[in-house]
Amino acid sequence: MNATDSTFMGLLQAQVRNEFSASQQYIAVAVWFDAKDLPQLAAHFYRQSVEERNHAMMLVQYLLD
């Protein structure tokens, strides 16, 4: 593995962390809206969380393949 490959892999790993972090943040917001009895807003943020998790998992699959 050369320096360019190593840099690219590092950037991909950082993006995986960013995507999972965003997913967790969306869950936190969704839970807050759930606690405030705002189910439509909560549902929106739960969906966003799943979307971010799916982004992370696509990158993980790329790294594993």
Residue ranges and their predicted role:
Residues 1-65:
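Iron-associated oxidoreductase/ferritin-like identity signal
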